[in-house]
């Protein structure tokens, strides 16, 4: 069985030219699959039937693997079995038609107004702090995705009209407003940006002058959140979710929020209506004389 796995790794590395990260992920998943098969005396790939594939998923779930990781394991196994079909080792792919457990929709966590004020209450004039605050203010002000913030250039912002041009999913461009505080923070950052010796027109650059990567932006946000005493873990998703939730609470205009967020389908935006209803239900329970629950 290991012989075919080695052939597969060579195929991925040399013909498909997958990244080392992808290759390592596939190897990790297939190592776990091999362990399950060996523990159950399956010594040949021809013994792997649809029921065996389901058994692998069941055992993986039993060991505590989450839904997203289960989907990744099934994908890795399915692609390897497809390779065995190409090699003539199998006639059909036994993983075809088998689905991983569906991932449940989780309500996104958001940051309340008090926490946001605490987060952004920083008047440091250090260049890195000016940059980081500008990123936070802009992301929260316009509800940007991480990739949208990372891709901004100097020409993306119009300070006179306070509009920002972003490239969203599917290379769809949209124009968004940004607020007074974000405008001020970005302009303060631009005053010191040249100190970083920028190598191109990226709006946010690292200390080496390169466009900041998604990971470096995430890391800076984590550091900022800890430093500002935020109790919960800070990440770009939370700022975007906070923007969406508070916009919906203030306007109740689902279509407008959909446009601002750049969602193709209204159903994606509707998750925030559940958040909004949850908030309203809590207020109702606390305020309505006939709704208060006995303790």
From Swiss-Prot:
InterPro entries, sorted = CB, DNA_brk_join_enz, Integrase-like_cat_sf, Integrase_catalytic, Integrase_recombinase_N, Integrase_SAM-like_N, Recomb_XerC, Tyrosine_recombinase_XerC/XerD
What GO biological process terms are annotated to this protein in UniProt?
Answer: cell division; chromosome segregation; DNA transposition
Its main localization is cytoplasm
- Where does it live in the cell? Cytoplasm
Residues the record marks as active site: 145, 169, 237, 240, 263, 272 (o-(3'-phospho-dna)-tyrosine intermediate)
Q: Which UniProt keywords apply?
A: Cell cycle, Cell division, Chromosome partition, Cytoplasm, DNA integration, DNA recombination, DNA-binding
Q: Which GO terms describe its cellular component?
A: cytoplasm
- Domain (Tyr recombinase) spans 106-285
Q: Which residues form the Core-binding (CB) domain?
A: 1-85
> From the UniProt record, which GO molecular function terms apply?
DNA binding; tyrosine-based site-specific recombinase activity
Functional note: Site-specific tyrosine recombinase, which acts by catalyzing the cutting and rejoining of the recombining DNA molecules. The XerC-XerD complex is essential to convert dimers of the bacterial chromosome into monomers to permit their segregation at cell division. It also contributes to the segregational stability of plasmids.
Subunit text: Forms a cyclic heterotetrameric complex composed of two molecules of XerC and two molecules of XerD.
Family per similarity comment: Belongs to the 'phage' integrase family. XerC subfamily.
Name the UniProt record assigns to this protein: Tyrosine recombinase XerC
**Naturally occurring in which organism (per UniProt):** Mannheimia succiniciproducens (strain KCTC 0769BP / MBEL55E)
